[in-house]
Amino acid sequence: MKVHVRKNDTVVVISGKDKGKTGEVLRVIPKTGKVVVKGVNLVKKHQKPNRQNMQGGIIEMEAAINSSKVMLFCEKCKKATRISHKLLENGAKVRVCKKCGETF
């Protein structure tokens, strides 16, 4: 499944319980079409004590959300935006903001 965002992109959640939150993409899972966004879709995991974490307990971590629920955030126009692809003279393919024309 094709995903329109990449790791380290800043995105805005456009639907669901975390609607309106902004965060950085930590991980992209193209096989399922999901992304993990920092500070979004937090779930509690019950961690057993092990060698790395002797204490154990309940930890909060980010869970994956569908990539269709996020939009790329443009730093120039400060809005969530769609993207288009543009071919440069040197043959490089870049992502461009549909609202202001800024390249990502």
Curated annotation (Swiss-Prot):
User: What keywords tag this UniProt record?
Assistant: Ribonucleoprotein, Ribosomal protein, RNA-binding, rRNA-binding
**Which Pfam families would you find in this protein's record?**
KOW (PF00467), ribosomal_L24 (PF17136)
Summary of the function given for this chain in its UniProt record = One of two assembly initiator proteins, it binds directly to the 5'-end of the 23S rRNA, where it nucleates assembly of the 50S subunit.
One GO cellular component term: ribonucleoprotein complex
An example molecular function term from Gene Ontology annotations:
structural constituent of ribosome
Protein name as annotated: Large ribosomal subunit protein uL24
Organism from which the protein derives: Clostridium perfringens (strain SM101 / Type A)
What family does this belong to?
Belongs to the universal ribosomal protein uL24 family.
What is annotated about its quaternary structure and interactions?
Answer: Part of the 50S ribosomal subunit.
Q: Which domain of life is it from?
A: Bacteria
What's any GO biological process attached to this entry? Answer: translation
| InterPro entries, alphabetized | KOW, Rib_uL2_dom2, Ribosomal_uL24, Ribosomal_uL24_CS, Ribosomal_uL24_KOW, Translation_prot_SH3-like_sf
Name the HAMAP family on file.
Answer: Ribosomal_uL24_B
